[in-house]
Amino acid sequence: MSNLQNIIECAFERVAEITPTNAEAELRAAVDEAIEGLDKGIYRVAEKNEQGEWIVNQWLKKAVLLSFRLNDNVVVDGAETKYYDKVPVKFADYDVERFKTEGFRAVPGAVVRKGSHISKGVVLMPSFVNIGAYVGEGTMVDTWATVGSCAQIGKNVHLSGGVGIGGVLEPLQANPTIIGDNCFIGARSEIVEGVIVEEGCVISMGVFIGQSTKIYDRETGEIFYGRVPAGSVVVSGSLPSKCGKYNLYCAVIVKKVDAKTLGKVGINELLRTIE
């Protein structure tokens, strides 16, 4: 355990007692370093290990929660309005050179909190990215999409208009929602509660997936919870109840595609040829 992690872990045991006036300088410095590391992409709340499994760094989530205890609300100037919050906006001190160096686009109306990382090639339409989130290279966050606290978004992902990717700071033991590389999430879909959408998936418009949602593979009859297998094309559907008197909502895997096919075939064609 690093010294930085140790300071944060120990402080979190007494989080309810910490206030902006009684916090030690060492703790402030540790939390600031952790938030800055998240902001720059040096640290990530979740990352893959050598076995390809997602590992959650709970101490970084604790650092985010501690930052709320350390800071009072202040007035934050914005282009069109003012804000009153404990967390500054990410771009508050950016100039032209900083934006060029970072290498992403942020159109008017995009709100990003400090402590989230935006990679090169990202396009942020009017959207919201919360603290602790990570957005990978080449990803599009479309209009009114929301990337929740600590969510992990892979490379070359398209989050369509109105998509909601759930955040998770409390309960602390819950895992962040993860969207793998090269995924397409259709308009107004919601992926929440630490669900993992693996690489190369296509989620159709208006699909809602949480930990209790049945994810039904129509080819095999298998049912998944909390994980969409790589290369899945998913639409909304329903399954009959045990008594057979009614149907309940589910997500349906209608087909699988490999990376080569996904690269050659348009998204709309994949979604339209599901029969």
UniProtKB/Swiss-Prot annotation:
The keyword Protease does not apply. Substrate binds at R105, D142. Pathway: Amino-acid biosynthesis; L-lysine biosynthesis via DAP pathway; LL-2,6-diaminopimelate from (S)-tetrahydrodipicolinate (succinylase route): step 1/3. GO terms for biological process: diaminopimelate biosynthetic process; lysine biosynthetic process via diaminopimelate. Keywords: Acyltransferase, Amino-acid biosynthesis, Cytoplasm, Diaminopimelate biosynthesis, Lysine biosynthesis, Repeat, Transferase. Gene3D superfamilies: Hexapeptide repeat proteins (2.160.10.10), Tetrahydrodipicolinate-N-succinyltransferase, N-terminal domain (1.10.166.10). It is found in: Cytoplasm. Its EC number is 2.3.1.117. It is an enzyme of class 2 (transferase). This is 2,3,4,5-tetrahydropyridine-2,6-dicarboxylate N-succinyltransferase. It comes from Histophilus somni (strain 2336). The lineage of its organism: Bacteria, Pseudomonadati, Pseudomonadota, Gammaproteobacteria, Pasteurellales. The gene is dapD.
